[in-house]
């Protein structure tokens, strides 16, 4: 699953000159892959796109930055939304797991 992570730190906790942006995460955690990293450095914000197999692995990945920044984690996808069923009955049946009877 893909996640957009926004890490925000205060200027006094800035990693510039102290390991840099990569010091705020652990890229060696199994089950996690850093897809992309961007910074709005003068705002002290780092944006990550991370693929993680589970939330525990994602938390371990972000652990190095836990005491110096906050992290907003949002699940994201590159898949389009499914087409919405046109019939309310089809929606209700799908929600309840009922077969519509058509093959």
Q: Where are the regions a protein language model picked out?
A:
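Conserved, structured core segments of small domains
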Residues: 1-103
